[in-house]
Amino acid sequence: MINPSEIIPGVLFYSYYSSLRKEKVAFLEHNMLVLQVSGRFTMETASEKFSMERGEMLLIRRNQLGELTKTPLNDEGYQTIVICLKEDLLRQIALEEQIETEKKYTGPNNIIIPGNDFLDAFFKSVIPYVRHSEQNVTNSVGMLKVKEAVLLLLHTLPDLKDFLFDFSEPYKIDLEKFMLSNYHFNIPIEKFARLTGRSLAGFKRDFQKIFNMAPRAWLQEIRLTEARHLIEKKHKKPSAIYLDLGFESLSHFSHSFKKKFGKTPSQWLV
């Protein structure tokens, strides 16, 4: 089976891995409900780190950056089932069920969902779609599964209404604090802008005022400065740090490092 498999287009996904897998940059655009079938799922953001194992469920808030680590345990491998709770589907559910909320959600971004018979039965009902992924499943079936998941979540934790049905744009947050915490994520400038609650033009304008540099130039500068610190003071190997600092390849990192400091990272290490 291809990993991850799209069981119901845009809605239901299944992942299986037999060896550890780390994804440095995960831009979590939509709300997601994750069931851990086996193995350990670990997510680390700028502000928190948490894990879950077999049988646990996690509701993940949209518009986050994180590092994901997927670890097989024992002989079971790593397996997850993910329900993608896209905004258009949630808006449709809100209309059909006459769900209204005027409060902007301000709670935690990631919530462990306590298990119960209803949610356990729901996820068992999803298993056949995974086992028979070669059969085409219509979008209407996908919508029904999303709606069932949402209603069961609200039955379990009614206060999740604000989490699920807050469709407002992100607040305009402290840009300097956010960038200093997240510069190492290799994502487009447009996504940095969105995550700070700004248009691209507004992001560039505010960025210039705060850092007195354009975003791309600043990102290159701070990543290379941190790389030199790690190599010089921590004796880190270039191959061990370039991905964690947001560089796409070792060759790109080495070229940029030499251009700025006059030596390659390996020469600097010596």
Spans of features found by a protein language model:
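Basic/polar phosphate-binding segments, predominantly the helix-turn-helix DNA-binding elements
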Residues: L152-D159, N186, E190-I222, Y242-V270
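A short, Lys/Arg-enriched amphipathic alpha-helix from helix-turn-helix/homeodomain DNA-binding modules
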Residues: G115-P128, M143-V146, D162-P188, A193-T196, ...
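Hydrophobic/aromatic-rich alpha-helical bundle segments in the mid-to-C-terminal region
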Residues: K49, H132-N139, L160-F165
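N-terminal regulatory/effector-sensing and dimerization cores
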Residues: I8-K103
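Amphipathic, well-ordered alpha-helical segments in soluble domains
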Residues: M32-L35, L89, F118, F122-S125, ...
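Aromatic/histidine-rich interaction motifs
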Residues: Q98-K124
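All-alpha amphipathic helical-bundle segments outside canonical DNA-binding/catalytic cores
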Residues: P108-D117, H132-K147
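A short, N-terminal "cap"/entry segment at the start of jelly-roll beta-barrel domains
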Residues: M1-I7
